[in-house]
Amino acid sequence: MKGALRGTPRVVRVAAAQMGPIQRTDSRESAVARLVALLHRAADQGAQLVVFPELALTTFFPRWFVDDIATADHYYETSMPSPATQPLFDAAKQRKVGFSLGYAELTADGHRFNTQVLVERDGAIVAKYRKVHIPGHASNEPNRPFQHAERYYFEPSDEGFGVWNAFGGRIGMMICNDRR
């Protein structure tokens, strides 16, 4: 495979899908319906890969601090795909369009990550990446009208920055503050 990639022009048409705000009261299903609509729109315009934002399934909940982190468990995914996100995977497979999806992940052993998956055009997950550089603060700052408590809600990944074979080439992922 190494030789086949070298010198071969690879062009992938990528769509950046901007969702707009998700309210705290919005359901996961309504967020996924918006993602599916954006995927179809991108596919209609010839996209092969749709990149969705960080934490695309929920409001950006680190803006609000809760004393008991377990009360925020409903923001986290424990499996991917899940019953709520399966329609997005099905649409990707049907339209033969891959995607990258950001979400909050709660592992079976209780770890919380800001995670991104890369999904190929057949609807299969080919890579999972967890945010390395977590910004913000880890405790409540009561004088702030909005928090930036990512360090409270997420732990940094120790897996580093990976690169995977996908979309006819090599592709990596990073999330927001990882760009530094």
Task: List PLM regions with ranges.
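Short polar catalytic/cofactor-binding loops
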Residues: Q18-R24
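Active-site catalytic loop in hydrolytic enzyme cores
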Residues: D90, T107-R180
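Conserved beta-strand scaffold positions in the cores of enzyme catalytic domains, especially
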Residues: V14-A16, K128
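Active-site metal-binding loops of divalent metal-dependent hydrolases
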Residues: M19, L55, D178-R179
